Regions:
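Interfacial juxtamembrane loops and adjacent helix segments
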Residues: 23-118
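Short acidic/glycine- and proline-prone juxtamembrane loop motifs at membrane-interface regions
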Residues: 160-167
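Membrane-lumen/periplasm interface segments of multi-pass, membrane-embedded glycan/lipid transferases
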Residues: 247-336, 436
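Transmembrane-helix signature of polytopic, membrane-embedded enzymes
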Residues: 110-113, 132-152
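Perimembrane helix-loop-helix junctions
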Residues: 177-188, 212-244
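Membrane-interface alpha helices of multi-pass inner-membrane proteins
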Residues: 155-157, 192-209, 214-220
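Membrane-interface helix-loop-helix junctions at transmembrane boundaries of multi-pass membrane enzymes
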Residues: 226-235, 330-353
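Transmembrane helical bundles and short interhelical boundary loops of multi-pass, membrane-embedded
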Residues: 245, 249-271, 378, 404-436
Length: 436
């Protein structure tokens, strides 16, 4: 209720995909030129178009206006063919919570506003449940994980119909489980646990294509849980291989290049040719982009609420963002694991770096306009899992051992206070919406 309708990043498009899934259509219709979509409620499409017109001006609207337009659209019956390729190209997995809420509200006679609220509520409940499960399962770094889960942008995304909450929470739970298994002295996983771990690894491929990389966290699980090194190899090859095959098959069926859709002029062939012909210049450009964009990604990922121009977007003060980063790094450094594990630390740090570089490379190839000073299109929310891996790597390294653990609780309180300040500032910025 406190966040403007369809205001989260790309929520307009996530809304249409969630509505489609709520009708049981898991696979979007495919058309020529990477144009995907399908039939959704006429009222749902008109609601999205109404909100989009306000975002593009930009022109503020109120909660009362949203309720009024919802009541008006109740007269718009039937289905209409819609195009929303930026979300229709994704699998339905990350839309199941929102779709369930939308379907329940529609079944109870609710209009588009009630459906939106129901979808948002179920989405945030599932997100919080998964992150709570991850914090319970994690053998170390729980305070860091809680802070990570409760940042203002994370809660803002969770309280929307975006696919991002599940994209964050499911891998976080997998990371926590793999770390617990690494420290668990149990001789072997049960068959049920093996199936559960395998399904989680395969499910990553249905979130985003590059998430197959994150299934590498299973390499941290010791041989003793599989019975033998051979059985471990078979399990990892089967699950990671199945995930890779699934993501390749999905993206072959629903190929999508953001630059073509958003009209940026991105040219993957030209970029690849430039990398081959001028590797040094390409590498320098790549690292220049990292150096320039990564600090912005933290500020954006920790302190931005809203996905459209003001008044529909707010950035927390930079000082607040940097103070939060310092606090979270201090917690990770001081709240060390009971047993220092430098191998796990190095592995997670490396995975975070590789994951980050692959994201930048993907946007360089598929989105960034030719001739741009740095790689464009990246957003802080894309790097949330890289931030989490980096923090957990620091926890496992335990640079200060147990000497500074008495400082962790005060730092945790400071971190929560900073995040509450950011969240309240965002809610206050949207006063124009929820007070009218």
């Amino acid at each position: 209720f406190l966040l403007p309708a369809l205001n989260a990043p790309d929520e307009i498009y996530h809304w249409q995909r969630a509505v489609q899934v709520s009708h049981g259509q898991l696979l979007a219709d495919r058309r020529k030129g990477q144009d995907y979509g399908g039939e959704i409620d006429t009222a749902a499409l008109e609601f999205a178009q109404w909100a989009k017109s306000h975002f593009e001006r930009p022109s503020a609207f109120s909660l009362t206006q949203v309720r009024q337009i919802s009541a008006t659209l109740a007269e718009s019956s039937g289905m209409v063919r819609a195009s929303f390729p930026s979300s229709a190209s994704f699998s339905p997995l990350a839309y199941l919570p929102q779709a369930a809420g939308i379907a329940m509200a529609r079944q109870l006679g609710g209009g588009v506003f009630e459906q939106l609220i129901a979808g948002r509520m179920l989405n945030v409940w599932v997100y919080l449940a998964l992150m709570a499960a991850a914090a319970w399962v994690a053998p170390c770094g729980r305070r860091l994980l809680v802070l990570f889960a409760l940042t203002a942008p994370a809660l803002h995304l969770a309280a929307s119909v975006s696919a991002d909450p599940l994209n964050i929470a499911l891998p976080a739970l997998l990371f926590a489980w793999c770390l617990r298994l690494r420290l668990d002295e149990t001789s072997r996983l049960t068959r049920r646990s093996l199936w559960g771990l395998g399904l989680m690894l395969v499910s990553l491929s249905l979130l985003k294509p590059i998430y197959v990389l994150l299934s590498g966290m299973a390499l941290l699980v010791p041989v003793r849980h599989f019975g033998s090194a051979r059985e471990r190899r078979i399990f990892l090859l089967a699950t990671i291989g199945a995930g890779l095959a699934l993501t390749l098959a999905w993206n072959a069926a629903y190929p999508f290049m953001p630059g073509r859709y958003w009209g940026t002029g991105a040219d993957p062939k030209a970029v690849l040719l430039h990398i081959i012909q001028a590797p040094r210049a390409s590498l320098a450009y790549f690292f220049q982009s990292l150096q320039h964009q990564l600090p912005i990604m933290w500020i954006d990922g920790w302190g931005r609420m809203g996905g459209y121009p003001p008044p529909f977007m707010l950035n927390a003060p930079k000082a607040l963002s940097w103070a939060a980063l310092a606090t979270m790094l201090a917690i990770a450094a001081f709240d060390g694991a009971d047993r220092r594990d430098l191998r796990a630390s190095a592995f997670m740090a490396t995975l975070a770096v590789v994951f980050t570089c692959v994201i930048f490379l993907a946007f360089w190839l598929t989105f960034s306009p030719p001739g741009s000073a740095v790689i464009q299109g990246v957003q802080g929310r894309y790097f949330q899992l890289a931030f989490l891996l980096t923090g957990w790597a620091l926890v496992c390294a335990a640079p200060f051992g147990a000497y500074c653990q008495r400082l962790v609780t005060p730092l945790f309180i400071v971190g929560l206070t900073l995040q509450m300040a950011s969240l309240l500032q965002g809610i206050e910025a949207f006063r124009f919406y929820w007070t009218n």
